[in-house]
């Protein structure tokens, strides 16, 4: 819930292109979380890779104005972006731990399909937790009325339904299936390809040119992510 809340607020701050760039923080955070909770090794190359990743993000979001360098994105959005990456990284490791405990409780004579469906069960649990959490937030902020108004917006509900299907259902379920069969860090690294995959459709839909600086920054960031688990 924390990661999604931060991610959607970062989208409001500076759009999905930069929001997904900050999500590349998830693999390093997943590595650190695995080190803390699972006792996985953190070598000096891992810290170097983290520095490269952060350098790539900084290169993308900063712009030179005269003799000074300034951040071209709002601070609030940056903080939400960092929170989104942290939430995704920590959540992925905790999900892996939960799936492992769940797998241990399955009887040996259970059908293999039960194991295959575990990621979808995990997604269902995460969705319920998110529903409860966001409902509490909306009630505390007295914004439930806006939710009911949004339900009558046919275009908005159409996009929301498609987003729910491809995001929480397909995307999250496959991500949990990935961590079920491989290390959380490796799975998170592959999922960090989103900033590259989103460049072309984002530029077409929003009719915005992608600057060389943004492209170079994205490449540097993904290089750092790859270094984190491949060196």
Predicted segments, located by residue:
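Alpha-helical transmembrane segments of multi-pass membrane transport proteins
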Residues: 26, 84-88, 163-168, 194
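Membrane-interface interhelical linkers
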Residues: 4-14, 55, 62-82, 86, ...
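Juxtamembrane helix-loop boundary signature in multi-pass membrane transporters
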Residues: 28-86, 90, 96, 203, ...
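Interfacial helix-capping/hinge residues at the ends of transmembrane alpha-helices
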Residues: 7-8, 19, 34, 92-96, ...
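Alpha-helical transmembrane segments of compact multi-pass small-molecule transporters, enriched
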Residues: 22-36, 51, 129, 133, ...
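Membrane-helix interface motif
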Residues: 88-108
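Membrane-interface helix-loop-helix junctions at boundaries between adjacent transmembrane segments
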Residues: 7-26, 33-42
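Signature of the 12-TM Major Facilitator Superfamily
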Residues: 18-21, 44, 121-124, 186-189, ...
